[in-house]
Amino acid sequence: MNFEIEQILTQIIAFLIMLGVLKKFVWKRLLNLIEERKQLIQSEFDKIENQKEEVTKLSEEYKAKLHDIDAEARRRIQEAVVKGRDIAHDIEQETRQKVTSLLNNAQEEMKLELAQAKEQLKKDVINISFAITEKLIHEKVDISKHQKLVEEAVEQVEIR
């Protein structure tokens, strides 16, 4: 390997001249471009960080809203259940009152019909008694006739 000193010195001088020219004309622009790029990247990172914070904040707000909505839904369901129970209780009370009223009416009607039947039975017994007495007065009473009249009277009561 033959290295020539002139060639090495020429290349060192050329490198230093090139470095001087680059420093004078390009180095400041290059540093400015690097700084601008650094600031742009930093601003993008800041934007990303802000967006992350905003997303986190919105996420927490949505979670809080969902919690509130769930609580409201549970409250409304509970109100509906209570209202349904109240309505069921009212219907049950109303039905009990109607049943009691119908039962009382039926009992009153039965009492009335029983009273009418008793009254009719009294009238029938009186009529039969009059009929028996009338026959007894018109005819001479003997035991067999008396027995026959009673049987006829009972048959008349059964027919009616």
Curated annotation (Swiss-Prot):
Spell out the molecular function terms from Gene Ontology. proton-transporting ATP synthase activity, rotational mechanism; proton-transporting ATPase activity, rotational mechanism
Q: Which domain of life is it from?
A: Bacteria
Q: How does it sit in the membrane?
A: Single-pass membrane protein
What keyword terms does UniProt attach to this protein?
Answer: ATP synthesis, Cell inner membrane, Cell membrane, CF(0), Hydrogen ion transport, Ion transport, Membrane, Transmembrane, Transmembrane helix, Transport
Question: What's the chief localization of this chain?
Answer: membrane
Give GO cellular component annotations, separated by semicolons. plasma membrane; proton-transporting ATP synthase complex
Which is one Pfam family of this protein? ATP-synt_B
Where does it live in the cell? Cell inner membrane
For this protein, the parts annotated as crossing the membrane are: 5-27
* UniProt record similarity statement: Belongs to the ATPase B chain family.
Q: How does it assemble?
A: F-type ATPases have 2 components, F(1) - the catalytic core - and F(0) - the membrane proton channel. F(1) has five subunits: alpha(3), beta(3), gamma(1), delta(1), epsilon(1). F(0) has three main subunits: a(1), b(2) and c(10-14). The alpha and beta chains form an alternating ring which encloses part of the gamma chain. F(1) is attached to F(0) by a central stalk formed by the gamma and epsilon chains, while a peripheral stalk is formed by the delta and b chains.
Give the protein's biological function: F(1)F(0) ATP synthase produces ATP from ADP in the presence of a proton or sodium gradient. F-type ATPases consist of two structural domains, F(1) containing the extramembraneous catalytic core and F(0) containing the membrane proton channel, linked together by a central stalk and a peripheral stalk. During catalysis, ATP synthesis in the catalytic domain of F(1) is coupled via a rotary mechanism of the central stalk subunits to proton translocation. Component of the F(0) channel, it forms part of the peripheral stalk, linking F(1) to F(0).
User: Which protein are we looking at?
Assistant: ATP synthase subunit b
Q: Which species expresses this protein natively? A: Protochlamydia amoebophila (strain UWE25)
The gene designation is atpF
